[in-house]
Amino acid sequence: MGPGPRLLLPLVLCVGLGALVFSSGAEGFRKRGPSVTAKVFFDVRIGDKDVGRIVIGLFGKVVPKTVENFVALATGEKGYGYKGSKFHRVIKDFMIQGGDITTGDGTGGVSIYGETFPDENFKLKHYGIGWVSMANAGPDTNGSQFFITLTKPTWLDGKHVVFGKVIDGMTVVHSIELQATDGHDRPLTNCSIINSGKIDVKTPFVVEIADW
């Protein structure tokens, strides 16, 4: 992978009819949105303080290959993964970025398919705060780096593959967001993933999206 940090490049969305998922709410309303098929967790430490767990729901029916990569890196089943890595880039009111499991500074990363793998699709958008998307260095350069949104960055739609949503632990995400950074958006205090893994989902459930 070439030198220099991976930059979040600007992202258009194509939502196929096959991606639509419906479920009945408690009051008989129909929820619309992608279905969570698996979950992963990150236990986070800032400096020497354990600050809690981030749980991310993953949309395996929409982007199965991207989800498979993320889950395998969370479990470490290939012998490498997110455990011990850090959030290396933090921009308040925009996003936090992590997943550089090779160099730790935003210039590296690797997927379970090889150094990089192609963009799977752009069926999901960056709908608001807490959505999880692949960081890249341009088209078809997905590896292990990812980011969690802290706004609704619609300009990233069509450029970065969205594959998950934080369903628990946004207080932890915001704790990372509030860390002081240097001139390169690197946190001055290490924000580390001290443990990670998979949480099985016995019954898939819908993350509701108003404009789905």
From Swiss-Prot:
GO terms for biological process: protein folding. Residues 41-198 form the PPIase cyclophilin-type domain. It catalyses: [protein]-peptidylproline (omega=180) = [protein]-peptidylproline (omega=0). It is found in: Cytoplasm. Expressed in kidney, skeletal muscle, pancreas, heart, lung, liver and to a lower extent in brain. It is an enzyme of class 5 (isomerase). PROSITE patterns: CSA_PPIASE_1, CSA_PPIASE_2. InterPro entries: Cyclophilin-like_dom_sf (IPR029000), Cyclophilin-type_PPIase_CS (IPR020892), Cyclophilin-type_PPIase_dom (IPR002130). GO terms for cellular component: cytoplasm; extracellular exosome; intracellular membrane-bounded organelle. Disulfide bonds: none annotated. Belongs to the cyclophilin-type PPIase family. PPIase that catalyzes the cis-trans isomerization of proline imidic peptide bonds in oligopeptides and may therefore assist protein folding. This is Peptidyl-prolyl cis-trans isomerase C. It comes from Homo sapiens (Human). The gene is PPIC.
